[in-house]
């Protein structure tokens, strides 16, 4: 009986530590299933062969990541036939504009962290709006900043609004629309622009267009200022998150492309290229984590969200200043 119990325990340990892996000899079968699941169509046989080669490399990378004893799991998703360069150039968008401005007030946060709850998530208070999909337009900077304002509005008024990213893409004359932008310059341009309109008045097209504001739209929010935060201790982000609401932040998205679920520990940090929204934090199985809202649709990650381990500068999350807007509630 004792031997049976020991065998069961060993089997459980092996199962717990088993890393999910794709059989590379079945790459062709996986690829055909992938094509069917995501309705992928290619121009010719040559392109299909090239995409299959990238797909094979993706499988190898996924298997490698799943062997790292990370608590995250990586799987085939809609990006599996795209190179990293394609993904970063089309589906992220954090990029230095030709012109730069700095109207935001800089605040240095160097005090010891305060005492707050072990777990906190603005979603549990219904203060985070729905997941969006930027598609092949490098406008993450617009999505992340507007998502933070949508949350501020929900915190203040207990109502969800859906702001127009296309307004920012077309009418922000400092950032570069689908070719990229920065968080603080987006906030600064909102100040110059006046009121922000909702999605139904200025629908998302996912391409650069001339500004189509007519002047008779009904603005719902006006930004009157912005802050940039120098955070010396990652732990202080908890206090900031609870105080100002969800925070747009810059990361290196290279390591999250094939993410499926769990807490990411090993994450590339070679250069910031994507903007996401910090919405919460917590602890799972003694692993402290941050929760971020992404803009790659609900069919990616944990229904559009991902988690990274705290206090390891995962994905370079503390390499750039965090930002927030000051809303004119009297407008």
UniProtKB/Swiss-Prot annotation:
Transmembrane segments: none annotated. Residues 1-21 form the signal peptide. It catalyses: Endopeptidase of broad specificity, hydrolyzing substrates of both cathepsin L and cathepsin B. Gene3D superfamilies: Cysteine proteinases. The keyword Hydrolase applies. The keyword Protease applies. It comes from the Viruses. Disulfide bonds join 137-178, 171-211, 267-315. Keywords: Disulfide bond, Hydrolase, Protease, Signal, Thiol protease, Zymogen. One of its GO terms (biological process) is proteolysis. It is an enzyme of class 3 (hydrolase). GO terms for molecular function: cysteine-type peptidase activity. Belongs to the peptidase C1 family. This is Viral cathepsin.
């Amino acid at each position: 009986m004792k031997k049976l119990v020991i065998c069961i325990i060993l089997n459980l340990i092996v199962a717990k530590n088993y890393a999910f892996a794709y059989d590379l000899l079945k790459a062709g079968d996986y690829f055909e299933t992938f094509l069917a699941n995501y309705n992928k169509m290619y121009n010719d046989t040559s392109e299909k062969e090239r995409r299959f080669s990238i797909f094979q490399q993706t499988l190898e990378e996924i298997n490698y990541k799943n062997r790292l004893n990370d608590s995250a799991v990586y799987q085939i998703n809609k990006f599996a036939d795209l190179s990293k360069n394609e993904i970063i150039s089309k589906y992220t968008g954090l990029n230095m504009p030709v012109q730069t401005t700095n109207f935001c007030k800089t605040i240095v946060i160097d005090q010891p962290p305060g005492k707050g709850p072990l777990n906190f998530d603005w979603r549990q208070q219904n203060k985070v709006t729905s997941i969006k999909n930027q598609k092949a337009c490098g406008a993450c900077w617009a999505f992340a900043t507007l998502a933070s304002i949508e949350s501020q509005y929900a915190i203040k008024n207990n109502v969800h609004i859906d702001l127009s990213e296309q307004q920012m893409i077309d009418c922000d004359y400092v950032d570069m629309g689908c070719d990229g932008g920065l968080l603080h310059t987006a906030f600064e341009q909102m100040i110059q622009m006046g009121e922000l309109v909702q999605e139904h008045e200025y629908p998302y097209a996912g391409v650069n267009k001339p500004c189509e504001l007519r002047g008779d739209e009904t603005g719902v929010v006006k930004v009157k200022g912005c802050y940039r935060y120098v955070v010396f201790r990652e732990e202080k982000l908890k206090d900031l998150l609870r105080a100002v609401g969800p925070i747009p932040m810059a990361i290196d998205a290279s390591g999250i492309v094939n993410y499926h679920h769990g807490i990411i520990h090993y994450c590339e940090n070679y250069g910031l290229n994507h903007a996401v929204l910090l919405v919460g934090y917590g602890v799972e199985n003694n692993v402290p984590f941050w929760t971020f809202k992404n803009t790659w649709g609900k069919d990616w990650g944990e229904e559009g969200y991902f988690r990274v381990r705290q206090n390891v500068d995962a994905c370079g999350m503390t390499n750039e200043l965090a930002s927030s807007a000051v809303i004119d509630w009297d407008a």
